[in-house]
Amino acid sequence: MNSIYQYKLATGEEIIGELLEEDEDFLYYKNVLTINRMIIDNSIVHTMNSWITGQFSDNDDTTIIAINPSHITSSNIPTENILNQYRKSISYYVQDSDLQDNQLNLLLCPP
């Protein structure tokens, strides 16, 4: 079963993320990104950005985001193209977070 879902929120934002669990009040996600649509040279291009600042700063993979389902106006199973871009974006954010952590450690604790 695919645990990655795409939602349109009441705010107009479009997000994608990995569903971990749900209860009667919230949906619990990790790795939530916004999907932004742009038209460049008559082609549709999607960019993905971190929805919550700092969610990729922990290497222990424990940042969980609770989403109130009453704020969701529509849902979708992402296309293969969107899924591939999502996976690449997540890899980038995780790698970038590791680089930032290493740089910060060097600044705080020089060799």
Identify what each model region corresponds to.
Residues N2-P111:
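Conserved RNA-binding domains used in RNP assembly and mRNA/RNA metabolism
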